């Protein structure tokens, strides 16, 4: 084959060279005399060879009628796939209901039908079959589809108005009688009798020619039996198995190349004889619409479609055809990937910001897989037949949706109407789950690796133990020009319907949370940076191997109570700025931006009262409508608060923790690390459970009982795998949102009298005295600028400066006014174990723990009249500072731990390090029911106070100074515990007496080196 291909190339080259000499075309060969002979393998032109054969008269007629005679009878470069007249006779028997003869049926063909038959079976290049799997590069064995001579203008039908999609969706009525969740009715403008009809292409791109050839099949590990099943050959004499004797075959769509009739060499290319007429099928959406057994699914799919006017298509089609219409439309499915890239508006300029996109356009002829070319792959869809849809929605798992949204009795007679009433965002996960981007990876032999929307096996081995068992689930297979449609006998629910998101998706009382969960759905395959929230919550909550407790504030709670703005509260000195916000579902009509279909309204916050927007005048100017871009003004605050709220209401449990929040434990950490306290458990299902965040705990512990917030679970949905076989947790509806504490570690220590001595030690390091002392001891000659010195100085600080970080003040962090942040905490969860005043007094006066004041006094005592510090004293003073800083930092550790009803041992890292080991110095936390003990590195066990523990705080950094900030850039959630009159030791060296660290200059040097302050 390879030699013959090369031989023809040389022949045509020789012919071209001789043309100018002899005026005719010749080819090179060793066994002929010019100009009377040519190579025996080289025939006449394609046209002449077909004409001479005598049994391709229909093909010849097509060529003649379409004006291609001269093209195919002269030197050129074409490949044709032709069927004999007998095949055309069979073709017309099946397609012409009034068939009498081949000639009569042919005479009925329109010019467009003729174009489709000829152009779809012709490639505008000369290829032998074995080269058709090579793509540009060249890259061998990857090509599945070829660009043929077909064009989108070959057939653009005229559609009567009543044949256009008829969207029967009515939407739902909210409590005020307003229509909500209604479809965008893209077709209504054209679907009216007065308009008459339209010319509309099923897609604006040219269809390709799909082939199943050995080299590509081998490369992609596609079996003969896969193609046999796809072409519906199983059970027929043409069935193709995987045995060694099965032989090789070549198919173009479902037409097979006749053995011995391939690569017939002609002067201007090749032709291949097929066993049937090659007809380019329509796209997947259209074969689903027209096959007669998937009308319910097709109706739902068409709700995502819209007619778009196409000027270039209009002009091109009018050049070929005499039509009176001024406009030609193309049918486009609104999807993340389609021929219309970056689709943000509907055909009438409607905003698509909150439209639930499909993953790809099933009508896209030139469908392209991500990271691939259109020639290498196509799509696959798993579509339930009508009987399966009826069983699912009338009697099965989809019944709940019809009962929730349908407005007629749930029976098969009313099914189509009721299906239309299911909102698009609810039906979209079902459709999306059944759309697979790769044909190559979705063939039957690979069924165990086909994944659902949660990336779990869609066809589990326990249900489908063999390929044959898998195939038995299908009624038939439909081949389209851009993919394969597997028609199923059952409906496969998406993981979305089994996850903790499902109740929220279905429920009209949780639309605010649902909007946030799905805000980024249209950006999951690409364009990640353009997602409005960039949180991708629906993807996160589809982790079906996880176990979630998902707390959902209802729309009523978000409207009637609201959410305190932690950023506004950070401006502690200006009470007039303090605010809380309510959130309500809304519609987006704006275009070309990042929007969220939620209205936010601000109200003044009175810390002595509970939130009561119904009886409070809204703050003037404190509003963000759905049409406000999320990068602007209060929309930034809206985005931040809603994302923070969702993060705080998602809890992830260990997979072996089947009880979750209904178990013995009372304290849990949310997705973002914020604590959730289960105050009471409610009934056996969890209804009546009381929960609270750090803010609610703080409010109940203040002296204002009127401001208390009581949060109660009203509904519980068991979505666990233990109950449902497939699931990932439990969904709890609550009457209002939880919130994290607005206290910082600095503020919490400041408020607790028992912590005042420890707090003073921490704070003194960054005082004027402490800063001056540090400069005396640690500033070196190479620290020429203040920025150089401050970078070094900050290592010894516990609290960072409350200012914007800059080159002149690196390490500074903006937070609430009059507050400071723990310098070395950064977007994680931590605990601080605080010795009380008695413990610090013991450490200082009995064990000689240095303080800033005592170190400064030591420095002063060893500084001469020329203000020169004695070198030995300096080394010892440095060791004193290292001792003090490490003593303090050792009480700051990672992991938020609680005095709780649990038993666990946790290895924690403190904030101080050991230069010799190269790691952070550890401590061990031992939890038993109602107790928490800390074991320090010396082996000393210190119990956490039973009366002062579990103080929830939050370290938060603002995007700007508190007076103008809009959101928090990062947070750490920190739990404070009192150690009573005990403290922790970071080194055995200082056990009994801290002064051991600097008894001699050598010991001071070694100690300062081993425990040097690095960060």
Task: Show where each model-derived region lies.
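Mature, structured domains of secreted/extracytosolic soluble proteins
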Residues: 5-6, 11-13, 26-1015
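Hydrophobic alpha-helical membrane-embedded or membrane-associated segments
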Residues: 15-18
């Amino acid at each position: 084959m390879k030699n013959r291909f090369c031989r023809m190339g040389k022949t045509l080259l020789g012919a071209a060279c001789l043309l100018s000499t002899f005026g005719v075309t010749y080819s090179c060969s060793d066994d002929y005399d010019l100009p009377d002979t040519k190579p025996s393998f080289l025939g006449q032109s394609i046209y002449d060879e077909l004409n001479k054969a005598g049994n391709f008269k229909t093909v010849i007629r097509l060529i003649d009628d379409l004006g291609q005679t001269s093209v195919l009878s002269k030197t050129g470069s074409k490949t044709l796939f032709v069927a004999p007249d007998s095949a055309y006779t069979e073709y017309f028997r099946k397609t012409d209901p009034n068939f009498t003869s081949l000639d009569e049926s042919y005479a009925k063909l329109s010019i467009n039908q003729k174009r489709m038959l000829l152009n779809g079976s012709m490639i505008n290049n000369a290829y032998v079959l074995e080269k058709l799997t090579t793509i540009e590069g060249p890259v061998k064995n990857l090509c599945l589809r070829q660009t043929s001579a077909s064009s989108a203008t070959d057939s653009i039908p005229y559609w009567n108005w009543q044949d256009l999609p008829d969207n029967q969706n009515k939407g739902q009525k909210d409590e005020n009688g307003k229509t909500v969740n209604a479809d965008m009715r893209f077709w209504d403008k054209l679907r009216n009798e007065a308009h008459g009809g339209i010319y509309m292409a099923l897609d604006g791109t040219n269809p390709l020619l799909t082939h199943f050839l050995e080299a590509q099949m081998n490369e992609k590990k596609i079996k003969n039996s896969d193609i046999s099943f796809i072409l519906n050959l199983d059970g027929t004499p043409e069935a193709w198995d995987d045995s060694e004797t099965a032989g090789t075959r070549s198919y173009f769509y479902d037409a097979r190349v006749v053995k011995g009739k391939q690569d017939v060499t002609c002067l201007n290319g090749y032709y291949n004889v097929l066993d049937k007429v090659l007809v380019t099928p329509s796209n997947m959406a259209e074969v689903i619409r027209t096959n007669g057994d998937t009308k319910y699914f097709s109706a739902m799919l068409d709700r995502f479609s819209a007619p778009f006017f196409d000027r270039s298509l209009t002009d091109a089609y009018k050049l070929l055809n005499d039509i009176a219409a001024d406009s030609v439309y193309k049918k486009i499915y609104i999807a993340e990937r389609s021929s219309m890239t970056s689709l943000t508006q509907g055909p009438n300029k409607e905003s698509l910001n909150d439209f639930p996109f499909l993953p790809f356009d099933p009508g896209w002829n030139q469908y392209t897989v991500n990271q691939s070319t259109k020639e290498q792959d196509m799509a696959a869809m798993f579509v339930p037949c009508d009987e399966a849809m009826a069983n699912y929605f009338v009697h099965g798992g989809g019944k709940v949706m019809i009962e929730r949204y349908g407005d007629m009795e749930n029976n098969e007679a009313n099914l189509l109407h009721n299906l239309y009433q299911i909102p698009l965002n609810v039906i979209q996960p079902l459709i999306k789950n059944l759309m697979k981007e790769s044909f190559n990876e979705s063939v039957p032999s690979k069924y165990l690796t086909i994944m659902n929307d949660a990336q779990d096996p869609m066809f589990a081995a326990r249900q489908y133990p063999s390929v044959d068992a898998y195939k038995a689930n299908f009624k038939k297979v439909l081949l389209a020009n851009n993919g394969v449609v597997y028609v199923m006998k059952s409906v496969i629910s998406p993981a979305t319907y089994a996850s903790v998101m499902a109740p929220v998706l279905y429920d009209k009382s949780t639309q605010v949370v649902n909007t946030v969960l799905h805000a980024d759905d249209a950006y999951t395959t690409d364009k990640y940076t353009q997602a409005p929230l960039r949180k991708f919550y629906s993807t996160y909550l589809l982790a079906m191997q996880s176990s979630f407790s998902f707390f959902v504030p209802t729309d009523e709670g978000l409207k009637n109570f609201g959410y305190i703005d932690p950023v506004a509260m950070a401006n502690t000195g200006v009470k007039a700025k303090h605010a809380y916000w309510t959130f309500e579902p809304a519609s987006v009509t704006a275009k070309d931006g990042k929007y969220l279909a939620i209205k936010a309204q601000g109200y003044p916050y009175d810390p002595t009262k509970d939130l009561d927007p119904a009886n409070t005048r809204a703050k003037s100017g404190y509003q963000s409508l759905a049409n406000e871009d999320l990068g602007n003004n209060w929309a930034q605050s809206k985005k931040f608060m809603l994302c923070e709220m969702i993060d705080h209401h998602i809890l992830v449990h260990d997979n072996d923790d089947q009880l979750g929040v209904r178990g013995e434990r009372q304290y849990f950490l949310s997705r973002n690390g914020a604590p959730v306290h289960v105050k009471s458990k409610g009934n056996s299902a969890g209804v009546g459970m009381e929960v609270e965040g750090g803010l609610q705990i703080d409010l109940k512990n203040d002296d204002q009982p009127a401001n208390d917030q009581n949060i109660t679970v009203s509904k519980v949905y068991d979505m666990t795998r233990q109950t449902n076989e497939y699931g990932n947790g439990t969904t709890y509806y609550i009457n209002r949102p939880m919130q994290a504490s607005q206290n910082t570690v600095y503020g919490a220590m400041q408020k607790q009298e028992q912590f005042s001595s420890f707090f003073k030690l921490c704070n003194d390091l960054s005082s004027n005295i402490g800063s001056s002392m540090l400069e005396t001891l640690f500033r070196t000659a190479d620290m020429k600028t203040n920025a150089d010195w401050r970078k070094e100085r900050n290592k010894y600080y516990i609290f960072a400066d409350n200012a914007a970080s800059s080159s002149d003040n690196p390490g500074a962090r903006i937070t609430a006014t009059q507050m400071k942040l723990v310098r070395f905490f950064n977007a994680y969860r931590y605990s601080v174990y605080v010795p009380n005043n008695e413990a610090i007094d013991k450490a200082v006066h009995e064990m000689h723990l240095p303080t800033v004041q005592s170190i400064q006094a030591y420095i002063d005592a060893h500084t001469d009249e020329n203000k020169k510090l004695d070198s030995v004293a300096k080394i010892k003073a440095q060791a004193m500072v290292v001792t003090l800083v490490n003593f303090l930092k050792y009480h700051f550790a990672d992991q938020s731990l609680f005095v709780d009803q649990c038993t666990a041992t946790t290895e924690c890292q403190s904030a101080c390090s050991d230069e010799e080991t190269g790691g952070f110095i550890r401590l061990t936390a031992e939890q038993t029911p109602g107790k928490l003990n800390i074991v320090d590195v010396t082996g000393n066990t210190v119990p956490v106070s039973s009366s002062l523990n579990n103080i929830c705080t939050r370290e938060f950094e603002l995007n700007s100074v508190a007076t103008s900030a809009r959101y928090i850039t990062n947070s750490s959630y920190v739990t404070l515990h009192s150690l009573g009159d005990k403290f922790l030791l970071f080194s055995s060296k200082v056990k009994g007496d801290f002064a051991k660290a600097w008894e001699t200059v050598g010991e001071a040097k070694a100690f300062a080196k081993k425990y040097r302050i690095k960060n």
